Swiss-Prot record:
Lineage of producing organism: Eukaryota, Viridiplantae, Streptophyta, Embryophyta, Tracheophyta
Signal peptide region: none
Keywords from the UniProt entry: Chloroplast, Membrane, NAD, NADP, Plastid, Plastoquinone, Quinone, Thylakoid, Translocase, Transport
Name of the molecule in the record: NAD(P)H-quinone oxidoreductase subunit J, chloroplastic
A molecular function GO annotation: quinone binding
C-alpha cells in the first residue's frame, strides 16, 4: 500500500519501497543504503525537520541488520505532525550506512549507540566510536549471534 509520502518520492523518482503503515498509521518506507543520502535531503526539504529517534535491530540470527529512523514534520500550527519511519537493511558482512548527522544533528548519539551495540558503520559520522561499551570491547553485544565473554565482574557490596 502506497501512502502520500511514497507517492511524492515516486513522483520525484527517488528509489524506495513502501512497507505499509504501522499500528498508528505512520508510513513505513524501505530505503537502500546508497539511496539514503539523497532521500534524507529530500525528506528534509519536504519538511521532516526533526529526527525523533534512530535505532537498530538484528533481523535474524546470522541474517541482516536494520537501522530505523523516525522523522517528524514539526510545524507551529500542526495539531498532529506528519511522521514517517525509514528502514534501511544492511548485510552483516558489510554493515555500512551513510550518516545523516549533517542533516539532523540529533542522530549523533543515536547512530553511535547503533554502532556500539550492532556494529553498523555510519559513514562520514564525525565521532563514530563506542558510547556505552569500553573502546577495548570486542564484538557487538545486541547482535543475536553475539557470544558473551567468559568472565565475571566483581562488584563491591555496599
Amino acid at each position: 500500500m502506497q501512502g502520500r509520502l511514497s507517492a511524492w518520492l515516486a513522483k520525484h523518482q527517488l528509489a524506495h519501497r513502501p512497507l505499509g503503515f504501522d499500528y498508528q498509521g505512520i508510513e513505513i518506507l524501505q530505503i537502500r543504503p546508497q539511496d539514503w543520502p539523497s532521500i534524507a535531503v529530500a525528506l528534509y526539504v519536504y519538511g521532516f525537520n526533526y529526527l525523533r529517534s534512530q535505532c537498530a535491530y538484528d533481523v535474524t540470527p546470522g541474517g541482516g541488520l536494520a537501522s530505523v529512523y523516525h522523522l517528524t514534520k514539526v510545524q507551529d500550527d500542526a495539531d498532529q505532525p506528519e511522521e514517517v519511519c525509514i528502514k534501511i537493511f544492511v548485510s552483516r558482512e558489510d554493515p555500512r550506512i551513510p550518516s545523516v548527522f549533517w542533516i539532523w544533528k540529533s542522530s549523533d548519539f543515536q547512530e553511535r549507540e547503533s554502532y556500539d551495540m550492532f556494529g553498523i558503520i555510519y559513514e562520514s559520522h564525525p565521532r563514530l566510536k563506542r558510547i556505552l561499551m569500553p573502546e577495548s570491547w570486542i564484538g557487538w553485544p545486541l547482535r543475536k549471534d553475539y557470544i558473551v565473554p567468559n568472565f565475571y565482574e566483581l562488584q563491591d557490596a555496599y
